Amino acid sequence: MLPEHQELLGRLTRQRLNIELSGDQIEKFSIYADRLVEWNEKVNLTSITEPEEIILKHFVDSLALLSLVQGKRLADIGTGAGFPGIPLKILLPEVEVYLVDSLAKRLDFLETVIKELKLTKVQTVHARAEDFARDPHYRETFDCVTSRAVARLPVLLEYAVPLLKKGGYFLAAKGSQAQEEVMESKKALTVLGAEIKDIKLFNLGAEAEHRAIILVEKTSSTPPAYPRKAGTPGKKPLV
C-alpha cells in the first residue's frame, strides 16, 4: 500500500473502531494488501481490489470483531483470503488461530502471507467445515469461531457450534439481513445447543452497507450427529 493508504487504514481503525494500530501492524496490513492484489490475478480471492475498498471492506470490517474475541483458540471457517482470521491474528499474536477453507489455492496464498508477515501460532486447514467440525482433534476445542462466509446463519451454526467449547462464542459477521437470519435459526440453535447473546450493529461508512455481528454462545454439548455429512447443512438447513 502507498503511504496515503497506510494513513487511511490507521485513521479509519481509530475513528470507526477506536483501535490504534502500531507502525508494525500497519506495515503487516500493507504487505497483506499488496499480496492479495498480486495473487488475485491468478487465484480468485476477492472482487475487492482497490486499496481504499480493501481497507474498509476487508480490514476494518474484519477488525470490527476484535473486541468480541475471547479465549486463546480461534477457528475462522470459510476463511477465503483470510478474513477475518488474518486481521484478527495481526492484532492478537497470543491467540492460536486456525484458518479453515476447502480450496487449496486459497490456503497456498495464506501460507505465503503467514510466512512473510512472520505470524506464529496460526495454521491453515484444508477441509470442508463439516469434516473439520467432526474431527475429534478439533471438535469442542475452540473458545471462539468466526465467519464472514456467505451461507445463511442456520447453515453457519451447524458448521461453527460443534467446534466450540461450552461457553465459547461464535461471531458471525453479517449484513443488514442479520435479524431475519436470526429468526430463521431457532431450530438450529435448539438442536445444536446454543443461543443468541447479542446482535452488534455498525456501519463502515456513509455509502457502505449496514453490518452486524451476531454473537452466539454455546450452552450445551452438541449431539454427535452434527454437523451432518459435507453438503447436507447447505442443502437441508436446520430451519
From Swiss-Prot:
This is Ribosomal RNA small subunit methyltransferase G. The keyword Cytoplasm applies. Belongs to the methyltransferase superfamily. RNA methyltransferase RsmG family. Coiled coil: none annotated. It is an enzyme of class 2 (transferase). S-adenosyl-L-methionine binds at G78, F83, A129, E130, R148. Keywords: Cytoplasm, Methyltransferase, rRNA processing, S-adenosyl-L-methionine, Transferase. InterPro entries: rRNA_ssu_MeTfrase_G, SAM-dependent_MTases_sf. Specifically methylates the N7 position of a guanine in 16S rRNA. SUPFAM superfamilies: S-adenosyl-L-methionine-dependent methyltransferases (SSF53335). It holds the Pfam family GidB. It is found in: Cytoplasm. GO terms for molecular function: rRNA (guanine-N7-)-methyltransferase activity. Its EC number is 2.1.1.-. It comes from the Bacteria. GO terms for cellular component: cytosol.
